[in-house]
Design a protein with these regions (language model features):
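Non-heme di-metal
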Residues: 1-237
C-alpha cells in the first residue's frame, strides 16, 4: 500500500531533512529549537510503525521509501563526492547518529522477523556458504532473469542502467572500510578482490568507469546519483 497517515507528507519532510543537513551546527540548533524537527520526528515514528510494526507483513511501501532515503542521506556523508566541503559539516552530528540508530534498530528487528533463525542454527555454516558461492557462480534461471536475458528491449535496458547507476557509478564498497586489523590470509584475499574492483589503481579499469561507458553508449546521464529518484527503496537498503 502507498497510503500514509493523514496529514503526513513523507516527500515534503524528506526535503526538509535535506535542508537540515546544510544547517550550521545542526546539533546545537536542534537543542535550542527542537520544534524545528518535531514534524520530521513524528513522520519517522509513523513510518517506523507502518514499515516495521508487523514483522509478518511486508510493510507500507512509501514508509520504507521514506526511511531508506533518510538513511541514505545520512550514510552518504561517510563518502567523499568531490564537491563543496561545507556539505560535510554535519557528518559527525550526534543527532543524525541518533536518527540512524533509531531507524536501523527497528529495521534490523523487522529483518530478523523475516528469517527462520531456528532453521539457520541447524545448518552447517561452511556448507551453506559453499552453496551460496555456487549459486552466485551459477545462478538459476528465474522468470525475471529469463526476461532480462531474452525479452528486455533497448528502452528497458536504459531504464535498468539508470536505476542501477546509483550503485554502479559510485565506489561505496564496505570492504574498503573493514580491511583494517590483524594481518591474515582472509584479509589478503579480500584486498585482492578490492583491488580488482578498483581497477588496481587505474581509473580506466575501475568497475564504475566501465559502467559509465555503458551508460554513455545509451545516451544516459553519467552523473553519480543522477537517477536517484528512480531507485526503489530495496536498492537503497
Amino acid at each position: 500500500s502507498f497510503s500514509t497517515p493523514e496529514g503526513i507528507d513523507f516527500r515534503l519532510l524528506e526535503q526538509e531533512f535535506v535542508a537540515l543537513l546544510d544547517l550550521e551546527n545542526l546539533d546545537q540548533q536542534v537543542t535550542q529549537t527542537p520544534h524545528r524537527v518535531e514534524a520530521l520526528e513524528a513522520a519517522i515514528a509513523a513510518a517506523l510503525t507502518l514499515a516495521y510494526g508487523d514483522t509478518s507483513k511486508p510493510g507500507n511501501e512509501l514508509a520504507h521509501w521514506f526511511l531508506q532515503r533518510i538513511l541514505y542521506r545520512i550514510n552518504r556523508l561517510n563518502l567523499f563526492w568531490y564537491d563543496d566541503l561545507q556539505h560535510y559539516k554535519n557528518e559527525r552530528s550526534l543527532y543524525l547518529q541518533w536518527l540512524r540508530d533509531r531507524i536501523e534498530s527497528a529495521w534490523q528487528a523487522w529483518e530478523l522477523g523475516q528469517i527462520d533463525v531456528d532453521d539457520l542454527k541447524q545448518q552447517d555454516v561452511q556448507q551453506t556458504l559453499r552453496d551460496w558461492y555456487e549459486a552466485d557462480l551459477n545462478p538459476p534461471i528465474t522468470e525475471n532473469r529469463r526476461f532480462l536475458r531474452e525479452d528486455l528491449d533497448r528502452e528497458g535496458y536504459r531504464w535498468l542502467l539508470a536505476i542501477t547507476s546509483l550503485d554502479g557509478l559510485v565506489e561505496a564498497s564496505r570492504m574498503s572500510r573493514i580491511l583494517g586489523g590483524a594481518s591474515n590470509s582472509v584479509q589478503a584475499m579480500l584486498i585482492r578482490v578490492l583491488m580488482e574492483e578498483y581497477g588496481n589503481g587505474r581509473l580506466s579499469r575501475k568497475h564504475s568507469t566501465f559502467f559509465a561507458k555503458m551508460m554513455a553508449e545509451m545516451n544516459l546521464d553519467t552523473t553519480p546519483e543522477g537517477y536517484f529518484n528512480l531507485a526503489p527503496w530495496q536498492l537503497l537498503a
